[in-house]
């Protein structure tokens, strides 16, 4: 199975092969959360779904110390209720553009065709178009090129 680190405290895990041996993704996530708690005394949130977009939204949905599962059957309907700001890659500027077009939720975004979105959002249009349908084709990548290396020290005085 694959682990794609995103930051010090966040990662995507593809456990689709392990679930055949060890049970559901939810059971595995519960076990991982318990191990983190025992080892560090810290809580962790987990989002389980059939793609990275919905797994991230699920994780953010139930913080702190939550566990949220979105099935493939629930995904497309779930996405309709999301505010566009909850979609990956939608920051304040993109949200403002979408609002100017009358797009406030995933359901609103479903009313737009890809050719209509492309002039406004460029390359990102295809991602938004698919996201509104619960589709995310990005795969978990175990090996990624490191973007930066840093260390941090805290001193008694500045």
Where are the predicted features?
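A short, charged helix-loop
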Residues: 67-81
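Structure-specific DNA junction-binding interface
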Residues: 1-64, 126, 130-146, 152-155
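Short acidic/polar capping segments at secondary-structure boundaries
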Residues: 18-19, 49-53, 74, 84, ...
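Non-catalytic interaction surface on structured domains
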Residues: 39, 80-87, 116-117
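DNA-contacting surface of Y-family translesion DNA polymerases
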Residues: 86, 94-158
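A short secondary-structure junction signal
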Residues: 58, 80, 98-100
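Residues that scaffold the ATP/ADP-binding catalytic core of kinase and kinase-like folds
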Residues: 57, 78, 120
């Amino acid at each position: 199975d694959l682990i794609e680190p995103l930051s010090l405290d966040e990662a995507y895990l593809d456990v689709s092969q392990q679930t055949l041996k060890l049970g559901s993704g939810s059971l595995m996530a519960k076990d991982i959360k318990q191990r983190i708690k025992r080892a560090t005394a810290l809580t962790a949130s987990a989002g389980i779904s059939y793609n990275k977009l919905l797994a991230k939204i699920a994780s953010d949905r139930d913080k702190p110390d939550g566990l949220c599962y979105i099935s493939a059957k629930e995904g497309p309907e779930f996405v309709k209720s999301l505010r566009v700001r909850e979609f990956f890659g939608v920051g304040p500027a993109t949200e403002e553009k979408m609002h100017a077009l009358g797009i406030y939720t995933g359901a609103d975004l479903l009313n737009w065709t890809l050719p209509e979105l492309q002039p406004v959002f460029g390359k990102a249009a295809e991602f938004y178009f698919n996201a509104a349908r619960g589709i995310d084709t990005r795969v978990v990548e175990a090996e990624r090129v490191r973007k930066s290396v840093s260390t941090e020290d805290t001193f008694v005085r500045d």
